[in-house]
């Protein structure tokens, strides 16, 4: 009697060629139910993956076991801020113009209860490397191991099929990286 757990397929899919991450703040409880109904019509879990932040879950009077604010981290020469949002929407696709139109549709559906506060465009470079040439994801599990690592399993009815996301924004000093790469090559 194995129950099939449904999840947002975009979580395990390959990185799309283009994407837009939209972050929203809870502006008002009024109209929130209507906004979430609009969101549910647009979110298919593949071309639009969504994540609820702790403030939105609390506003809905719900509780998600394991959901908590990611702590800010500091160390020698390193500051990792913790920027929380009520709602995260990951628009995935192949065409930047189409993503822009879908983002506008999404923002209209969520207003006035949820207000956009940040947008980040993303893209896949080459075979999945970042702009420094580093191939990301080489340590990520694949197949059933990936599903076990990324998708909350059975026995947790409230969140079965869900995932916890920590979305990171990296700023690279490409000039410095290029200079170090050239210096390294000169010494080989």
Set out the residue ranges of the language-model regions.
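Long, histidine/aromatic-enriched segments associated with O2/redox biology
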Residues: 1-187
């Amino acid at each position: 009697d194995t129950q099939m757990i449904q999840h947002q397929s975009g979580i395990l899919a390959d990185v799309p060629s283009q994407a837009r991450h939209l972050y929203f703040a809870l502006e008002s409880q009024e109209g929130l139910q209507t906004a979430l109904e609009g969101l549910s019509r647009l979110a298919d879990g593949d071309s639009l993956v969504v994540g609820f932040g702790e403030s939105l879950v609390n506003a809905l009077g719900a509780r998600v076991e394991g959901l908590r604010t990611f702590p800010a981290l500091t160390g020698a020469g390193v500051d990792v801020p913790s920027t929380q949002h009520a709602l995260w929407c990951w628009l995935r696709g192949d065409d930047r113009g189409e993503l822009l139109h879908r983002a506008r549709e999404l923002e209209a559906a969520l207003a006035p209860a949820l207000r956009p506060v940040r947008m980040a465009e993303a893209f896949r470079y080459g075979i999945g490397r970042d702009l420094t040439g580093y191939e990301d994801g080489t340590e990520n599990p694949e197949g059933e191991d990936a599903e076990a690592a990324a998708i909350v399993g059975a026995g947790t009815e409230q969140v079965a099929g869900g995932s916890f996301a920590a979305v990171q924004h990296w700023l690279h000093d490409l000039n410095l990286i290029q200079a170090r790469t050239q210096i390294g090559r000169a010494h080989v």
